Amino acid sequence: MSNVNKVYDWFEERLEIQAIADDITSKYVPPHVNIFYCLGGITLTCFLVQVATGFAMTFYYRPIVNEAFASVQYIMIEANFGWLIRSVHRWSASMMVLMMILHVFRVYLTGGFKKPRELTWVTGVLLGVLTASFGVTGYSLPWDQTGYWAIKIVTGVPEAIPLIGAPMVELLRGSASVGQFTLTRFYSLHTFVLPLITIVFMLMHFLMIRKQGISGPL
């Protein structure tokens, strides 16, 4: 017996790896499933690409109002393959939004939101909201004219709400006006808070799909 087999047997004895693998590979797939049922998986793939490329850019990006734009320029012009990483990040973000929208339409048109899959639908809708939030927060991080005015408009929307509007605006911006605190908050949301929440809801979403299976045809 080779050392590799000994190591495998050691883990197998404690974790029952083969049983887990058999459970994953032997899951029943209904005959009506087609390529359109892969849209959710493609959305997940885009998210993983976002995580990888976004993590790579954190080594160079500086969330400081006076340096953010220059750091993005450095990524695009001077950093090795920086232009490629940022371009992949941008295009995979657009692809993720598109695949998510198509996935929602597919689920709705095939009745995948009906009993007993209501909670799966709810978590999916929440993931859609989180995806849109990624777009809003990430759009402003270059801190160019487009990003600055976008963040100013977005954070100013709650101001129309009576009584709580002004405090909500200040909470989003971190101060009375758009500035360093705003950029810091949006950077934290985009790189830590939103990814963490998204991963939690994705796990819930996938576990429910795993438990309930794929919905049948109409």
Curated annotation (Swiss-Prot):
Heme b 2 binds at H89, H190. Keywords: Electron transport, Heme, Iron, Membrane, Metal-binding, Photosynthesis, Plastid, Thylakoid, Transmembrane, Transmembrane helix, Transport. It is a multi-pass membrane protein. Heme b 1 binds at H103, H205. Pfam families: Cytochrome_B. Heme c binds at C38. Binds 2 heme b groups non-covalently with two histidine residues as axial ligands. Binds one heme group covalently by a single cysteine link with no axial amino acid ligand. This heme was named heme ci. The chain crosses the membrane at residues 35-55, 93-113, 119-139, 189-209. GO terms for cellular component: plastid thylakoid membrane. One of its GO terms (molecular function) is electron transporter, transferring electrons within cytochrome b6/f complex of photosystem II activity. Heme 1 (or BH or b566) is high-potential and absorbs at about 566 nm, and heme 2 (or BL or b562) is low-potential and absorbs at about 562 nm. PANTHER family: CYTOCHROME B. Component of the cytochrome b6-f complex, which mediates electron transfer between photosystem II (PSII) and photosystem I (PSI), cyclic electron flow around PSI, and state transitions. Belongs to the cytochrome b family. PetB subfamily. The 4 large subunits of the cytochrome b6-f complex are cytochrome b6, subunit IV (17 kDa polypeptide, PetD), cytochrome f and the Rieske protein, while the 4 small subunits are PetG, PetL, PetM and PetN. The complex functions as a dimer. This is Cytochrome b6. It comes from Cuscuta gronovii (Common dodder). The lineage of its organism: Eukaryota, Viridiplantae, Streptophyta, Embryophyta, Tracheophyta. The gene is petB.
